[in-house]
Amino acid sequence: MDGNYSDSYEEIRITGTGYDVKAGVIFRPVEESPFRIGAYVNSPVFYDLSLSAAHDLSMYGGEAPATFQDKDAAGNIGNVPCYTKGDKGQTVDYDFRLNTPWKVGVSMGHTVGNYLALGATYEYAWYDHMDNRVKDGGYYDYYWGDYYESSSSDDAMNADTRANLKGVSTLKVGAEIKPTSMLSLRFGYNYVSPMFRENAYRDQSIGSNGVDIATSTDYTNWKAMNRFTCGVGFNYENLNIDVAYQYTTQKGDFYPFMSYVNENAALSNIPTSCKVDNNRHQLLMTVGYKF
């Protein structure tokens, strides 16, 4: 610490459109039984996105900046300031495309009389095969008067995605109990496996537009997510009221920037991770009336 101060600001806004295709089947293995099995496939969501970002970093104070030892072009070792004082910032506008992963899933459901319903779903998504795409041109359709943009895969970013992300499994189980015809009690649990590999990191050295336009360096290596839900539903003639509570919990390791390793260990900069918890409580209510 050198006695100086800093403050920072960052704002990111992403807008766009996307589309996907879903297909599935449901069948009953035994015609006389309410037990059913389902399967589905979900195509990637094909996003066309626009990013607008801004950031500013200010360094100020009455002391000289801290220094570190480094070699100059002539090989002489000297003290080099860790930073320069003043305001440094930039604004970024960038258009790109992103294809999310393919997803497949299977489900099972069963009912007991008219008072109990049980369900379970397993889904797998190939997050390590997302396709980051760069807009690299286009053409004009003179007949229709429209301009169509073309894009190609960002090979460097996609290689980094495969190195740091992995397939994600999602398990959902739930039950609904109807003690009376007017009242429903609901319980559920979701488990989502980690998207990030154990030693995943945000690589700021790859040759990709996604790195060139970045306005921050921090990242969080999130672990598995658990969701617990419960709810109650009330129906009376044409009126229905539903109240649901959901608790989501997830742990992660926060890093301010990636590790930088130098041949001279004294010049290496390896940050210490910080354990973080992302716990969220949600209460939802829906009121409906049938006319």
In which residue ranges do the predicted regions lie?
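Outer-membrane beta-barrel porins/channels
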Residues: 1-291
